């Protein structure tokens, strides 16, 4: 699949990488429909010390569920979903108290090596994926962007 990486400060490029796979029972594989460029992406983009090939973070996306892990009960293949920027595991003390942005398992990562790609693996999907009614074709381009 294609994925964006930084090639140098102020420049990104496409590389071919392996399509992500289900690794845990509560994983979901999403086919990315839209993603955006966030301020934190721009920090790396503008960094003069960025290493060529460094993964482009990208952490906001909407997509279609392609595959689900055996523990997934909240979505099914074909569902249109939001993959939120920050999400928790749903199991730790912080998540159970309603503070999933400070999840005990979410230390220095968004559980993704970048969503500016054709597919992504989304962890803890039962807790955090947000199902959207309908399919992308039900929405105008302006609504999707």
Predicted feature descriptions by range:
Residues 1-2:
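Extreme N-terminal starter segment of soluble prokaryotic enzymes
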Residues 14-16, 42, 119:
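Well-ordered beta-strand positions in beta-sheet-rich domains
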Residues 22-35, 48-93, 133-136:
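Glycine-rich beta-strand-centered segment in the early N-terminal region that forms part
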């Amino acid at each position: 699949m294609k994925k964006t990486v930084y090639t140098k400060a102020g420049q990104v490029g496409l590389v071919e990488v392996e399509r992500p796979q289900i690794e845990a029972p509560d994983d979901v594989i999403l086919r990315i429909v839209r993603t955006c460029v966030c301020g934190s992406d721009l920090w790396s983009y503008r960094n003069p010390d960025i290493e060529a090939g460094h993964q482009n973070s990208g952490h906001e996306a909407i997509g279609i569920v392609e595959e689900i892990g055996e523990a997934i009960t909240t979505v099914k293949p074909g569902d249109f979903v939001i993959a939120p920027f920050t999400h928790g595991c749903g199991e730790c003390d912080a998540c159970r108290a309603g503070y999933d942005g400070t999840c005990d398992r979410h230390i220095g990562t968004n559980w993704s090596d970048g969503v500016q790609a054709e597919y992504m693996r989304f962890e803890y999907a039962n807790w955090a994926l947000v199902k959207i009614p309908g399919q992308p074709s039900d929405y105008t381009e302006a609504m999707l962007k």
